[in-house]
């Protein structure tokens, strides 16, 4: 919850990761002023003011809309933690156990041709459901990859960068 609150108060994902990394090296609990300084935020006073102005009951309600896990949790995918600017907090819906299986990422154009969709279908069929298909949920190649996997009895993970309750 605290990571979510930091984000809502204005820290970027990278600033939160910096704070979490620093926090691992000290034995005492960090004060909000320390967090503002360590994070490198542009205006610590504004961050702290926003933090204290947050309605905790409302934010908690918003936070509880979907289950989540953070980069500090054991279920956080190791391979995701190795990328630059790994998401500090992820919300999910569905089977979290799919993260434990070998995966293949599929990325492509939102305006794919019928040939592109057929190519994705062929590649996914060739995987013979040995890998979990990971892709966005945008139209085009992303959707074609998910559909091909599901039509062939496979499993998928959809990554939505905007959040589970934001539609575009």
Predicted regions and their residues:
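Generic beta-strand structural signal
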Residues: 88, 102-104, 131-133, 154-155
């Amino acid at each position: 919850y605290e990571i979510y609150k930091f984000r809502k108060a204005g820290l970027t994902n990278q600033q939160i990761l910096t704070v979490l990394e620093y926090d691992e090296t000290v034995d005492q609990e960090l004060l909000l002023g320390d967090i503002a300084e360590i994070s490198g935020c542009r205006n610590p006073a504004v961050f702290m003011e926003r933090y204290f102005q947050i309605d905790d009951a409302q934010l908690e309600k918003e936070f509880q809309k979907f289950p989540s896990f953070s980069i500090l949790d054991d279920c956080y995918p190791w391979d995701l933690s190795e990328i630059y600017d790994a998401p500090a907090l992820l919300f999910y819906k569905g089977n979290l156990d799919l993260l434990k299986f070998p995966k293949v990422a599929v990325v492509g154009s939102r305006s794919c041709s019928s040939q592109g969709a057929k190519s994705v279908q062929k590649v996914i069929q060739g995987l013979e459901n040995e890998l979990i298909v990971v892709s966005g949920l945008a139209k085009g190649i992303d959707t074609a990859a998910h559909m091909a996997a599901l039509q062939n009895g496979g499993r998928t993970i959809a990554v939505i960068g905007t959040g589970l309750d934001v539609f575009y």
